Amino acid sequence: MGVEIETISPGDGRTFPKKGQTCVVHYTGMLQNGKKFDSSRDRNKPFKFRIGKQEVIKGFEEGAAQMSLGQRAKLTCTPDVAYGATGHPGVIPPNATLIFDVELLNLE
């Protein structure tokens, strides 16, 4: 349970997000069956969120906080750190495990 991180390509290994910092990422979100439900890459616009402000689901934040600058990783988020039993009607089914391909582009 929780978030599992699998490195796709390593980052600098030194610069990690700190609480209150803004993470600038590109991501693609998929269901376990591979169905894409969202992607900042498709919009060609990086996504920004602040660490520690609950602006994203828990698993996404926990995973990104462990990534170093420039790293690209696959985050597998179990329902307890995603949308849980409720899901997100019309997009995420109840009790769904979500997979994100996340690249940490910058910290502000």
From Swiss-Prot:
Question: What name does UniProt use for this protein?
Answer: Peptidyl-prolyl cis-trans isomerase FKBP1B
Q: How is its activity regulated?
A: Inhibited by both FK506 and rapamycin.
Transport among the record's keywords? no
- Write out the GO biological process terms: 'de novo' protein folding; calcium-mediated signaling; insulin secretion involved in cellular response to glucose stimulus; negative regulation of calcium-mediated signaling; negative regulation of heart rate; negative regulation of insulin secretion involved in cellular response to glucose stimulus; negative regulation of release of sequestered calcium ion into cytosol; neuronal action potential propagation
- Can you tell me which family this protein belongs to? Belongs to the FKBP-type PPIase family. FKBP1 subfamily.
Q: Which reaction does it catalyse?
A: [protein]-peptidylproline (omega=180) = [protein]-peptidylproline (omega=0)
Q: Could you give the subunit structure recorded for this chain?
A: Identified in a complex composed of RYR2, FKBP1B, PKA catalytic subunit, PRKAR2A, AKAP6, and the protein phosphatases PP2A and PP1. Interacts directly with RYR2.
Q: Which GO terms describe its molecular function?
A: calcium channel inhibitor activity; calcium channel regulator activity; FK506 binding; peptidyl-prolyl cis-trans isomerase activity; signaling receptor binding; transmembrane transporter binding
- Keyword entries, A-Z: Cytoplasm, Isomerase, Rotamase, Sarcoplasmic reticulum
Q: Which gene encodes it?
A: FKBP1B
> Tissue expression, per UniProt?
Detected in heart muscle (at protein level). Isoform 1 and isoform 2 are ubiquitous with highest levels in brain and thymus.
What EC number(s) are associated with this protein in UniProt? 5.2.1.8
Annotated InterPro entries: FKBP-type_PPIase, PPIase_dom_sf, PPIase_FKBP_dom
| Domain annotation PPIase FKBP-type: ranges | 20-108
Name where it mostly resides.
cytoplasm
Q: Where in the cell is it found?
A: Cytoplasm; Sarcoplasmic reticulum
